[in-house]
Amino acid sequence: LVFCEMYAGGKYDPPGENYEFSLGLNGLGSCATQYASRYMDVTVCRDGNEYKLHFQRGEIVGQMEVTPLTRKKTGTTIRWLPDLEVFTDIDIPLDYYRDVMKRQAVVNAGVTFRLRSEVSAGRFDTQDFLYENGIRDYIAELAGEDPITEPVCWEAERQGRDRADKPEYKVKLNIAWCFSNRVHLMEHYHNSSFLEHGGSPDKATRLAFVAALDKY
């Protein structure tokens, strides 16, 4: 269903606890990618079985294959090839993928993201991105060896609502910062998505920081 029907994601299903802080999951990405691919192979391991699906140019080929697993295994593997009849410009710089994967590693602490780039037939360059302590390690990396202050990390989780007539939702916050006379940078992420222009979180952070200093 996720690969064949638009808006089939479970992000907004009540209570939605599995997806409260997730990027995407509206039911668009997987389906749109499948329709825009020359082929897509999906393998899902769960509940003691391995499930396989094969698509070609937006159509499922054959039936779903179900194979019992002999050992406990979970996870999903998706392989696809963009359809050149859909994507006419595929000259995407490798640095773009490096940047995206590094940022995902920053906000998904302890998860390794591996980039494999084919430099010649059968030969790959591999680069891993891993931040065991998430944004804390990222701030320490940016600040270098001689920051004015050591990195500080705050975490909090709250419940609230935008208006009295709106349902409550959870907010989970992670903030890491330090003072440095060499690096001047502020970055913001929402549900693991990098906010290039900062948006509301940037304004809120600046106002709160100045207010706290004034109060002190």
Annotate the PLM regions.
Residues 1, 31-35, 204, 208:
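Short amphipathic alpha-helical face segments that pack within enzyme cores
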Residues 3, 38-41, 197-203:
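A broad, low-specificity signal for short, low-complexity segments enriched in glycine/proline
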Residues 3-8, 79, 206, 210, ...:
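Amphipathic, well-packed alpha-helical segments that form the structural scaffold of globular domains
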Residues 3-12, 75-77, 174-187:
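Active-site-adjacent bridging/hinge elements
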Residues 5, 9-143:
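GHKL-type ATPase core
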Residues 95, 102-104, 110-216:
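GHKL/Histidine-kinase-like ATPase module
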